[in-house]
Amino acid sequence: MCSPTTENNNNNNDHLVQSSDPNHPANLIPALCAKFWTLGWVTGTGGGASIRSDDLVYLAPSGVQKELMKPDDIYVLSLAAQAQSLDKRQRVYLRSPANYKPSQCTPLFLAAFTKRNAGCCIHTHSHWAVLVTLILETQGAGKDREFMINNIEQIKGFGKGFGKSGNLGYHDTLKIPVIENTAHEEDLTEFLEEAMDKYPDTYAVLVRRHGVYVWGENVHKAKTMCESLDYLFQLAVEMKQLGLPWVTDIEPTVPTRK
């Protein structure tokens, strides 16, 4: 694993994570992760979140108990400086915390920011997400590469795709690609980017036996889509237990107006 470089070691740019604004990324990330911990999404230091503010990217560190995270624990890097780096695997951090290591999720978060112009990316270890990938695994090769569900109201919580206006409708089919897990998280990057290319309209990628990455134009959209996905994953697991299909052919109901 590549070690990070940090600019301006004299003062470590601590001002980048100091703000009284509750909506500042350095304050939002700990608040979000504390909430996600109560949902079981970031148990045992797993998972994480990152927020982009123009050129600056704020990242939760590795190994931190997410419910106890503080603004001082946040890493900050510059997308422009990262783009100019000769070694793309080498991180150029503007600000680094004293007691933690950079998250191996970092290159995956950066993929969401650079390939989808996302403003926020969330990674959870939701057990519902993991269960869905295990259920898909039983479908056999060729049928385990995407999660699909339709005719469920919560699908309306997802946008139609990158650069498109509006949200999916009740009868639309939501498709989430599944990639295989790797021993080291950063090695997922290439597979995540391939899934983004193959599914240009997706806002999420499932990682088999691991969890899910979800991104959005801003924190609000990333968070609400992550919540909607977790709802759908739980619903899908329970539907499977009842023998109910995830994809159905239902004729639209049209009201009769007099």
UniProtKB/Swiss-Prot annotation:
It catalyses: 5-(methylsulfanyl)-D-ribulose 1-phosphate = 5-methylsulfanyl-2,3-dioxopentyl phosphate + H2O. Residues 1-21 are annotated as: Disordered. One of its GO terms (cellular component) is cytoplasm. Zn(2+) binds at residues 123, 125, 210. The active site is at residue 153. It holds the Pfam family Aldolase_II. GO terms for molecular function: methylthioribulose 1-phosphate dehydratase activity; zinc ion binding. GO terms for biological process: L-methionine salvage from methylthioadenosine. Pathway: Amino-acid biosynthesis; L-methionine biosynthesis via salvage pathway; L-methionine from S-methyl-5-thio-alpha-D-ribose 1-phosphate: step 2/6. The keyword Repeat does not apply. It is found in: Cytoplasm. Its cofactor is Zn(2+). Substrate binds at residue 105. Catalyzes the dehydration of methylthioribulose-1-phosphate (MTRu-1-P) into 2,3-diketo-5-methylthiopentyl-1-phosphate (DK-MTP-1-P). Belongs to the aldolase class II family. MtnB subfamily. PANTHER family: METHYLTHIORIBULOSE-1-PHOSPHATE DEHYDRATASE. This is Methylthioribulose-1-phosphate dehydratase.
